């Protein structure tokens, strides 16, 4: 089992497109993926778009990613990288 704390830092937060990217990436791994919103304790299945969207995580929200399974280390690294790179939405000057 792996666990990592991340902060949503893209301007629009975890909106539909970003959530879809996260779910697609999570679905590439056999490990289970759960996202927990640190401030509310709300938990989402990282492989369910509806579940992820229901977190309603704006910019600045701290999430805990938990993965469990044979490829959990690779899964958590891939998901953290996606979030850290702001889902590929923003270029260096902060404009889409």
Task: State the predicted function of each range.
Residues 3-4, 8, 95-96:
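N-terminal loops that bind phosphate or other acidic moieties
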Residues 58-96:
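C-terminal structural segments of small proteins and small subunits
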């Amino acid at each position: 089992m792996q666990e990592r704390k991340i902060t949503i830092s893209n301007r629009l937060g975890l909106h539909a497109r970003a959530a879809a990217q996260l779910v697609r990436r999570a679905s590439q791994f056999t490990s289970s993926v759960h996202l927990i919103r640190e401030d509310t304790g709300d938990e989402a299945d990282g492989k369910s778009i509806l579940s992820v969207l229901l977190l309603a995580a704006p910019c600045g929200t701290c999430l805990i990613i938990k993965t469990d399974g044979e490829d959990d280390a690779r899964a958590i690294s891939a998901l953290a990288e996606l979030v850290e790179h702001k889902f590929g939405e923003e270029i260096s000057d902060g404009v889409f």
